[in-house]
């Protein structure tokens, strides 16, 4: 089995401390911190952090915690607050102006009103190092598990001051893009390049960075990038997601991965919609049986599927502890709704999000972990 590394990109919103609405202030942030890099995104109220390459979940937890604390401190110094949430609960990160760059201006000119409300935030997990052919193999095996991964970080139930009825409204907003959603089965590098060339020729994408599939070969680094998830409410939930994604890639690239499980594109898209709508506390579509099952059943099946790889990397105890914590506390969407039910005030929901975003100084990865075997 390959020695798979991890990296995580987290997108955040900058909020005005008075109105708790998105604030167009990303251009004021420095490009690097001690823990990783910081990038500007499409909406000027967004920033994105990127960890260094990590080999263990403990290292990843440490880097993510440090990045969040550094960005929150930087935001506070400039009069803003940092929120890890899929969509802005109050106000909107759009409509334009978009971030002032030639690429983003061209996107606005080309796609028009699709740009509106695209100040949404996700958590992107990179697993590497993989060449293109290997990343495609891993992505094909991972497709059926995308609805389960989406469940883990549903974190966008409120938008423009009201409950959307979805656990992940970000998923719905993001699906407006022509090349967003579950990826197609891609059988070779030649097939991949053919699909990309067709999308470019049609104008559906301007470049390979606009392949907004839920899993894709990264266009910048030699990884498989899984981008199905909302911005994780907490560092723990981001680490849980990353551990399970690496587990899936590890199974796909093992000596006996089994054949790619065939899943019809329409069924997979419906299953992802179902996960985004009902969330972790509801019911989701099992793409194997075509039946609705309690969402936690999908997650439990996922953990059992990747258990050998989790054991190999020493991640099983940590993943089990993180899942137990999530099961006890509920998903981020549920936690936000409980705050609103108690206070009947969307501002209290945002305050809750802000508290969850920044980890305590003494935060550590739950669960006992051992070093990977040789």
From Swiss-Prot:
Entry keyword set: ATP-binding, Ligase, Nucleotide-binding
GO molecular function: ATP binding; glutamate-cysteine ligase activity
One GO biological process term: modified amino acid biosynthetic process
Catalytic activity: L-cysteine + L-glutamate + ATP = gamma-L-glutamyl-L-cysteine + ADP + phosphate + H(+)
InterPro entries: GCL_type2/YbdK_subfam, GCS2, Gln_synth/guanido_kin_cat_dom, YbdK
EC number(s) reported in the record: 6.3.2.2
Primary enzyme class: ligase
Matching Pfam families: GCS2
Keyword Protease set for record: no
Keyword Transcription among UniProt keywords: no
Biological function: ATP-dependent carboxylate-amine ligase which exhibits weak glutamate--cysteine ligase activity.
HAMAP family named in the record: Glu_cys_ligase_2 (MF_01609)
Protein family according to the UniProt entry: Belongs to the glutamate--cysteine ligase type 2 family. YbdK subfamily.
Protein's name according to its UniProt entry: Putative glutamate--cysteine ligase 2-1
């Amino acid at each position: 089995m390959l020695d798979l590394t991890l990296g995580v990109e987290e997108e955040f919103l900058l909020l005005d401390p008075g109105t708790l609405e998105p604030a167009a202030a990303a251009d004021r942030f420095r490009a690097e911190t001690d823990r990783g890099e910081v990038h500007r995104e499409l909406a000027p109220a967004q920033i994105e952090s990127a960890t260094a390459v990590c080999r263990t979940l403990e290292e990843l937890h440490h880097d993510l915690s440090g990045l969040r604390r550094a960005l929150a401190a930087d935001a506070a110094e400039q009069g803003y607050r940092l929120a890890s949430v899929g969509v802005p609960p109050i106000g909107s990160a759009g409509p334009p102006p978009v971030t002032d760059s030639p690429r983003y201006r061209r996107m606005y000119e080309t796609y028009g009103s699709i740009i509106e409300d695209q100040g949404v935030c996700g958590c992107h997990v990179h697993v590497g190092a993989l060449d293109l052919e290997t990343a495609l193999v891993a992505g094909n095996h991972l497709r059926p598990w995308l609805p389960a991964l989406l469940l883990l970080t549903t974190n966008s139930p409120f938008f423009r001051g009201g409950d959307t009825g979805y656990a992940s409204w970000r998923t719905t907003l993001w699906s407006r893009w022509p090349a967003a959603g579950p990826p197609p089965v891609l059988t070779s590098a030649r097939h991949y390049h053919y699909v990309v060339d067709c999308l470019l020729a049609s104008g559906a994408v301007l470049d390979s960075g606009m392949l907004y599939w839920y899993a894709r070969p990264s266009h910048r680094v030699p990884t498989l990038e899984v981008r199905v998830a909302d911005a994780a409410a907490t560092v723990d939930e981001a680490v849980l997601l990353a551990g399970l994604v690496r587990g899936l890639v590890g199974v796909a690239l093992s000596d006996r991965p089994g054949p790619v499980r065939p899943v019809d594109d329409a069924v997979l898209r419906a299953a992802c919609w179902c996960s985004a709508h009902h969330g972790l506390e509801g019911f989701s579509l099992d793409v194997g049986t075509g039946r609705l099952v309690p969402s936690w059943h999908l997650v439990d099946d996922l953990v059992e599927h990747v258990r050998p790889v989790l054991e190999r990397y020493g991640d099983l105890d940590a993943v089990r502890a993180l899942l137990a914590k999530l099961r006890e506390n509920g998903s981020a969407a549920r936690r936000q709704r409980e705050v609103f039910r108690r206070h009947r005030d969307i501002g209290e929901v945002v305050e809750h999000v802000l508290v969850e975003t920044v980890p305590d100084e003494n935060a550590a990865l739950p669960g006992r972990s051992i070093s990977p075997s040789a």
